[in-house]
UniProtKB/Swiss-Prot annotation:
InterPro entries cross-referenced by the UniProt entry: RraA, RraA/RraA-like, RraA/RraA-like_sf
NCBIfam families for this protein: NOT-MenG, PRK09372.1, PRK12487.1
Protein name: Putative 4-hydroxy-4-methyl-2-oxoglutarate aldolase
Entry-linked Pfam families: RraA-like
EC number(s) recorded for this UniProt protein: 4.1.3.17, 4.1.1.112
Oligomer and partners: Homotrimer.
Keyword check for Metal-binding: yes
Enzymatic reactions: 4-hydroxy-4-methyl-2-oxoglutarate = 2 pyruvate; oxaloacetate + H(+) = pyruvate + CO2
Cofactor note (record): Divalent metal cation.
Binding annotation for substrate: 75-78, 97
GO molecular function, one term: metal ion binding
Source organism (scientific name): Pseudomonas paraeruginosa (strain DSM 24068 / PA7) (Pseudomonas aeruginosa (strain PA7))
């Protein structure tokens, strides 16, 4: 499904929350949406690696990296694995790397910036917890939609207006 966030905002103004405009689109898929799966981690992408190995059909991984601009929480290998396992997209409140390869990957990816340094893998982080960034709270099981216009969150699945 191709999502257009302005159209969703117009059709469901009482349902959506708009994330502050701080993210850039890096993925090969410009528009994406799905059920939220959250990870909260700081400069450690161990849980990201675990989750992209799982079936992600209809889901978007929302990674609260604390806004760190010192390490990349996603690179080409994990992005390609996520695409292979059916993830709709990944939103990273932090950095990613290998952006040229990720731009060719059939996956939606939005992040704050790119950074060439990988993270440590110490197994530290929390899965499926409520996270807040960009003025919006992301709850597992709710829905997120993203495109070149921005990122929105809804408590229920939204259909594109006909």
């Amino acid at each position: 499904m191709h999502y257009v966030t302005p159209d969703l905002c117009d059709a469901y103004p009482e349902l959506v929350q708009v994330v502050e405009p701080m993210f850039s689109n890096f993925g090969g898929r410009d528009a994406f949406g799905g059920e939220i799966v959250t990870i909260k981690c700081f400069e450690d992408n161990s849980l990201v690696k675990e989750q992209v190995d799982k079936d992600g059909k209809g889901k978007v991984l929302v990674v609260d990296g604390g806004g760190s601009l010192r390490r990349a929480l996603l690179g080409d290998m994990l992005a390609e694995k996520a695409a292979k396992n059916g993830w709709e997209g990944i939103v990273v409140y932090g950095c990613i790397r290998d952006v040229d390869v990720i731009a060719q990957t059939e996956l939606g990816v939005q992040a704050l910036a790119s950074h060439p340094m990988k993270t440590d893998k110490r197994g530290i982080g929390d899965l499926n917890v409520v996270v807040t960034f960009g003025g919006v709270t992301f709850r597992p099981g709710e829905f997120v939609y993203a495109d070149n216009n921005g990122i929105i969150v809804s408590p229920q699945a939204l259909n594109m207006p006909g």
